[in-house]
């Protein structure tokens, strides 16, 4: 059975210090990597993200600020949505990211079948009912 994972690409400043030609080369490698994953069915979607956005917080979303405010190394610059056999396979794919040699960071996260907070609440209710 295939499992779903998201690769988050972090550190939006990985291009610093690279020439336009070097950036073009890496982006070409990145595109080829993604197209290969799409053609063999392991990647289902993937997109870069804009560097702008909004951050909503506070009760009832009262605070809306320009963002993201994360450090550049923590900011999410894009994602791939994968369907593969295991976390090990997703990690092996992530290790092939062409941006890693230039400071990009790839985070691999499994997609939950249900909200973890909801699952925790249901487990607590079952435990209390059994007590």
Show the residue positions of the predicted features.
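Conserved, structured core segments of small domains
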Residues: 1-131
């Amino acid at each position: 059975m295939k499992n779903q994972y998201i690769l988050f690409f972090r550190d939006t400043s990985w291009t610093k210090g690279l020439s336009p030609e070097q950036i073009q080369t890496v982006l070409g490698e990145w595109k080829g990597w993604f197209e290969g994953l799409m053609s063999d069915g392991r990647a289902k979607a993937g997109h870069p993200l804009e560097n702008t956005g909004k951050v909503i917080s506070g009760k009832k979303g009262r605070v809306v600020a320009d963002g993201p405010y994360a450090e550049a190394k923590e900011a999410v610059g894009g994602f791939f949505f994968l369907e593969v056999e295991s976390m090990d396979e997703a990690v092996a794919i992530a290790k092939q990211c062409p941006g890693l040699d230039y400071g990009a960071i790839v985070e691999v996260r499994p997609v939950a079948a249900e909200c973890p907070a909801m699952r925790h609440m249901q487990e607590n209710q079952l435990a209390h009912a059994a007590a």
